[in-house]
């Protein structure tokens, strides 16, 4: 059997784990799920003949290396900043690796080493980034195959809740790492091309500069710019495009409300507020007023 190691058993990994477990018998896969919480790892594997859950501390070099060495493919569902040590282990032991995260400079720097060993390091293969890339290229290739020319490209994606579960004022729920939601949009200005002109939106204005779209059967949504769209211009083969824009979808009103947190400085994680875990929401907000 082929051995797949999944590191991280949090919210983002749930669907992946269930999918691979369902496929494990037919595809002859043995799934090892490693997490700092043994309970989290084993909640999927108890009683399953083709899976096991283990306690795996990614900061423990011996534990991490042993788990990687005993696998054929490693899927890291860790926060993006922790992928790099796993990637180095995969190169050391000659293992393929998959993540759902954007390619960091540190990960890109390992490209030649991975290629030299004949390894596949596949990143940006989740929902966003991931499915958006694949659906984009499917549409672009279809247009080109028919002799069409791309003048404008806009791609919208977002982790939205099902209408029947939409029962709070934010019209939003955490389905992935909450920290990543809080930090969304940070790390540099959003960059894109609009009608032949380069545009930049700094973080402090990101959630105030939105546009609206209508999705048939589901209603009106808003979109804010998603990171640096320009880096995909050559990857998508859109060198002569007049508009290139990738956006994140939210329900109408989300961005305006979230912008209040941004302007108050509540999304800044560069400092720690002592005893904040024991404060009421009112007390915490009052710190910034």
Region locations from a protein language model:
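Hydrophobic/small residue at the entry helix of a nucleotide-binding pocket
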Residues: 12
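Rossmann-fold cofactor-recognition segment
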Residues: 47-60
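ADP-ribose/adenylate-binding Rossmann-like module
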Residues: 89-107
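C-terminal catalytic/substrate-binding lobe primarily of soluble NAD(P)-dependent oxidoreductases
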Residues: 145-289
């Amino acid at each position: 059997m082929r051995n797949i190691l999944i590191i991280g058993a949090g919210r983002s990994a749930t669907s992946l784990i269930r999918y691979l477990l369902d496929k494990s018998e037919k595809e002859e896969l043995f799934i090892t799920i490693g997490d700092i919480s043994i309970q989290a790892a084993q909640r999927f594997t108890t009683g399953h003949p083709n899976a096991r859950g283990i306690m795996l501390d990614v900061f423990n070099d011996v534990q991490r290396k042993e788990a990687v060495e005993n696998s054929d493919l490693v899927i890291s569902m860790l926060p993006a900043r922790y992928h790099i040590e796993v990637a180095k282990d995969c190169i050391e032991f000659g293992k393929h690796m998959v993540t759902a995260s954007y390619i960091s400079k540190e990960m890109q720097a390992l490209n030649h080493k991975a290629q030299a060993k004949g390894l596949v390091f596949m990143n940006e293969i989740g929902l966003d980034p991931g499915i958006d890339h694949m659906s984009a290229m499917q549409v672009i290739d279809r247009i080109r195959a028919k002799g069409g020319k791309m003048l404008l490209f806009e791609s919208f994606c977002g982790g939205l809740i099902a209408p029947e579960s939409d029962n709070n004022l934010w019209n939003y729920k955490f389905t992935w790492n909450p920290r990543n939601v809080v930090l969304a949009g940070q790390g540099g200005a959003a960059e894109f091309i609009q009608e032949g002109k380069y545009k930049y939106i700094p973080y402090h204005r990101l959630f105030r500069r939105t546009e609206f779209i209508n999705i048939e059967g589901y209603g009106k949504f808003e979109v804010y710019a998603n990171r640096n769209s320009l880096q995909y211009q050559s990857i998508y083969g859109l060198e002569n495009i007049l508009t290139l824009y990738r956006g994140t979808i939210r329900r109408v009103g989300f961005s305006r409300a979230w912008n209040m947190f941004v302007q108050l400085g509540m999304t800044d994680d560069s400092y720690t507020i002592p005893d904040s875990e024991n404060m009421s929401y009112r007390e915490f907000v009052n710190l910034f007023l």
